[in-house]
Design a protein with these regions (language model features):
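Conserved hydrophobic/aromatic beta-strand scaffold that supports enzyme active sites
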Residues: 27-29, 40-44, 64, 86-88
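Short, charged/polar surface micro-motifs in flexible loops or helix N-caps
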Residues: 35-37, 46-51, 71, 93, ...
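Short acidic-glycine-tyrosine-enriched beta hairpin
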Residues: 75-94
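Ligand-binding loop in jelly-roll beta-barrel domains
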Residues: 91-115
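Short, well-ordered beta-strand segments in beta-rich or mixed alpha/beta enzyme
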Residues: 43, 66-72, 105-109
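A short, N-terminal "cap"/entry segment at the start of jelly-roll beta-barrel domains
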Residues: 1-39
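Glycine- and acidic-residue-biased ligand/ion/polar-headgroup-sensing regions
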Residues: 53-75
Length: 115
């Protein structure tokens, strides 16, 4: 099965709280394929989120992120990432933790490495 074909529409999927140590992070699935792990969705961080308790993250999939609204601060790097910025992370690339002062919304695309 592949991601479903979808023409422009208002997504019906609800915002769902991401479980774990950090509260205030929400996800909204736009399209996914459980068989391949391909996923497109939105991530929303509420003001005051700090993911430092979970430390740096790395995944076993490619992750592309486009910052639509707000800004993220990476305290480890001492950098702020703002709306309009983009990241493309290969499997295993460490990133985070993040801090927010206001609402952050990101488009996230994930897919497994092939080859």
């Amino acid at each position: 099965m592949a991601k479903p074909e979808q023409e422009f529409h208002q997504p019906a999927a609800p915002w769902t709280a991401v479980g774990g140590l950090v509260r205030g992070i929400w996800t909204r699935t736009l399209a996914d394929d459980p068989a391949t792990g391909a996923y497109t969705g939105l991530l929303r961080y509420e003001p005051g989120v700090d993911t430092s308790p979970t430390g740096m993250r790395a995944h076993d999939y490619w992750e592309e992120v486009y910052l639509l609204e707000g800004d993220l601060t990476d305290p480890r790097l001492g950098e702020m990432f703002t709306a309009g910025m983009y990241a493309c992370r290969p499997p295993g690339m460490e990133h985070g933790p993040w801090r927010t002062e206001r609402v952050v919304v990101m488009l996230e695309i994930r897919y497994k490495a092939t080859g």
